[in-house]
From Swiss-Prot:
Residues annotated as signal peptide: none
Principal place of residence: cytoplasm
Protein name: Cytoplasmic tRNA 2-thiolation protein 2
Keywords per UniProt: Cytoplasm, tRNA processing
Keyword Ribosomal protein: no
Higher taxonomy: Eukaryota, Metazoa, Ecdysozoa, Arthropoda, Hexapoda
Cytoplasm in keyword set: yes
One protein family per Pfam: CTU2
Length: 403
């Protein structure tokens, strides 16, 4: 059985901060001898905790991680229909290139699946210009074996088009932008946006008759997501947020994270080795430009990045811990209508205290005039939201308060 070492997570790179044409730290452009195959090479790749190796040996090593993630658990059936989600980030292009390579091998080594690619355009939601069509066309030409679809986040699944038929849509017609403006806190907006993104991906996969979706999250993304889920009140489903297989999508569609064991440094090296051109040169997550303290998500991301910079094994520790968490659910347990996470229907003193505090805050100066006790109001509100998990209930409350 193939295993992946846990000592290769010590990276201090910043995939999202890569500059086009720059050489990542750890790549030696001077000629040298590969420690793996003993062949002289014009450039050597030295990952943390590994000896210098040539381009071919490095690519074989990192591609093996991709294949091992899928093969060890046997989560991808033979001849499965796969939807690959590309957002222009370095990670998504690495996943695209790895899948393309795996599908162009000989019969013995080939990854037997039928893949389609969808570019999820989310820049208009952030008030930015959409991706350059010429860049998308160049990407489609390089990986012409895949059908290339495009859809804009916030638009109905009916707007899904092949790249050759796609044209950018005006922001005024995007209902998601209007809904985000109704939420008061950036924490709620980022969380709501993430759930809408997952729902749209599931709808696209269903329309294209794909049973599996490939997501490009790497180890640092999943470590951040684990802590964020716990902070938002989704601890009960945090295991699925970082697992290789997430089966919460609609219509039985399964989300796979085959790059979960890759580090930022490995992504940087792969981009350089394959001469990939990410469409997003800097981190473009919604609301990140507002600062680390603007939301729980931003704060958690900055916290993980700071720990990773000063203690290089932090991401590995957090990520591996998340992999050992199991979801305590049973098949008959109800699901949240929004995020599809399992619902904990038991009345929690902690949640009651949160709702009580919220009721008191909303009552304000009218509290002395209220006929009902705030505790009664809190319990009634919790029962009204019994089809939503705590995190999604917070989003719903933010919608009502913001409107």
């Amino acid at each position: 059985m193939c295993s992946i070492g846990e000592d290769d997570f010590g990276d201090e790179g910043g995939t999202h901060a890569m500059v086009a044409g720059s050489v990542p730290s750890g790549i030696d452009l001077s000629p040298g001898e590969c420690s793996k195959c003993d062949i002289s090479s014009d450039e050597l790749f030295q990952l943390n905790f590994r000896t210098p190796e040539c381009r071919d040996c490095f690519l074989a090593y990192v591609r093996h991680k991709f294949r091992a993630a899928l093969g060890a658990a046997k989560v991808l059936p033979r001849d499965a229909e796969v939807l690959l989600v590309v957002d222009g980030s370095a990670e998504s292009l690495v996943l695209l290139d790895m899948l393309y390579y795996a599908q162009t091998q000989n019969t013995f080594k080939r990854l037997h699946c039928s893949a389609r690619m969808v570019y999820l355009e989310d820049q208009p939601v952030q008030g930015r210009d959409p991706a350059d069509l010429e860049s998308l066309e160049a990407l489609s030409k390089r990986y012409e074996a895949f059908e290339f679809y495009v859809i804009t986040l916030g638009l109905p699944v009916g707007s899904l088009k092949l790249l050759k038929d796609y044209s950018p849509v005006a922001q005024e017609s995007n209902e998601l932008i209007q809904k985000l403006s109704q939420l008061r806190s950036l924490t709620s907006r980022q969380d709501y946006l993430q759930q809408q993104r997952k729902n749209l991906i599931a709808s696209v996969a269903q329309k294209l008759h794909c049973s599996h979706v490939f997501n490009s999250s790497i180890s640092v993304d999943l470590a951040t997501q684990l802590l964020t889920s716990i902070a938002l009140g989704r601890g009960g489903s945090a295991a699925l947020d970082v697992a290789l297989l997430d089966d919460r999508l609609a219509a039985g569609i399964k989300l796979l994270r085959p790059l979960k064991d890759l580090t930022e440094q490995e992504v940087q090296f792969y981009v350089h080795a394959q001469r990939l051109q990410p469409l997003l040169m800097a981190s473009s997550r919604y609301g990140q430009e507002l600062g680390d303290a603007a939301s729980l998500q931003n704060l958690t991301s900055a916290f993980v990045a700071n720990l990773q910079k000063n203690f290089s094994s932090t991401v590995s520790t957090v990520f591996r811990t998340g992999g050992k968490i199991s979801e305590s659910t049973h098949p008959e347990q109800a699901k949240c209508n929004h995020c599809q996470s399992a619902l904990d229907v038991e009345l929690s003193d902690t949640l009651l205290a949160i709702e009580y505090s919220r009721s008191v805050s909303e009552a304000g100066v009218r509290l002395n005039e209220a006929i009902e006790d705030p505790e009664i109001i809190s319990k009634r509100r919790m029962k009204l939201n019994d089809e939503l998990c705590h995190a999604c209930s917070s989003i719903e409350a933010d919608f009502k308060n913001g409107s």
